[in-house]
Amino acid sequence: GRVYIDDFCARHRIPLVKSPHVGDDGVVQAIRSSGLDWLFIVGWSQIAPQPVLEAPKRGVLGMHPTLLPEGRGRASIPWAILKGLPCTGVTLFKLDEGVDTGPILAQESVAISDRETARTLYDKINVAHQDLIRRVWDDLVTDRIRLQPQDDSQATTWSARRPQDGRIDPQSMTVAEIDQLVRA
């Protein structure tokens, strides 16, 4: 399972604010007026501006589909496969003004099989998101969380993937490289 946010919010009578940009004035005002302690931003590839980071009482938490500080940036699932990593994971962290640089609350590892595809890894990452939230929820609502700064000396940044990055060239690529590219 996937849960569609519109249906979930309607079923549970939860106010839903939609916007194409996380920093819109209406979004910031809705967050402030809600009295939220924490705001979760998951699956949003925009950088939250300072007014959003300051709107909830405690801050903004994000999920990133790598074990930060490795793999800051974009296209985490394809890159994990392309790099031949044995595992990746999910990081719950407090957002700051940087790109995936905030202090870490918790992480959940995800094994990458030899035949992993982007689809299967995406599904594993979704399950890890849920497991991670369940694991930290009590500490989060009782204000017993511990944030650990990231070790910037261990950080790597992965760039966005472009259509031409998926081009297969059988003249210069090995069969293994082509296989990896197709699966990613």
Give names to the regions the model predicted.
Residues 1-184:
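One-carbon transfer enzymes
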